Amino acid sequence: KLLSYLAPRNTAEQIRELTKVFDGNRERVAIEIAKIVCAESYLYGKIEDCPTCEGTGEVGNNDKWKKECYDCNGSGTEIGFNDEIGKVNYQDTLDKFNEAVKKGNLWTPDTESQKLSEAAVYHGICAGLAVLTEGILVAPLEGVVSARFLKNGNGKHTLSVSYAGPIRSAGGTGQALSVLIADIIRRDFGLEFPLMSYDEIERYKEEVGMYRGLQYRPSNPQ
């Protein structure tokens, strides 16, 4: 999926240029690429019906079996791009996006603007992770499942990123930095810091304690 998102852009050229700008600092390059790809998808993207499932979110034989459409993760929609994608200088794209951020209201709940924003954030996270993994594509292609805007316990929206098993191939640094990238991007969309419930924290502590294969085992207070 990531390859199809990046195909119409100049991401490879941007990576080479930014590698020189940041003197080979991969982490800085990854964060900047994530911001660029997110901005491009938001500014030049448009929500369309997924052709694979014809907008239903499901594929299969109507009478015998159905399953969630892989191409759209069951949403029934996908993101397409207008003719500007790949033609506008990345710095101009960032400037245009930053102006939109300053004005606010990048998205409205339960509208196509939310779907577009979620897709843009997802693209940014995957692209940034791809830079960090140095070509080990299974992590950014299959390891990050989705990015969604969900409500905190206080009723305000936050960013939720879902991961799957292939994320393990990114390595610990790549996994951790993908969360950092997500935290940086979510601020542009006015999303609050996630508020973890007591039950979620306790479950995390239990699961970490049960998983003995960790290189570093944090204590419960940590």
Region annotations inferred by a language model:
Residues 50-53, 69:
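A broadly conserved sequence feature marking short terminus-proximal activation segments
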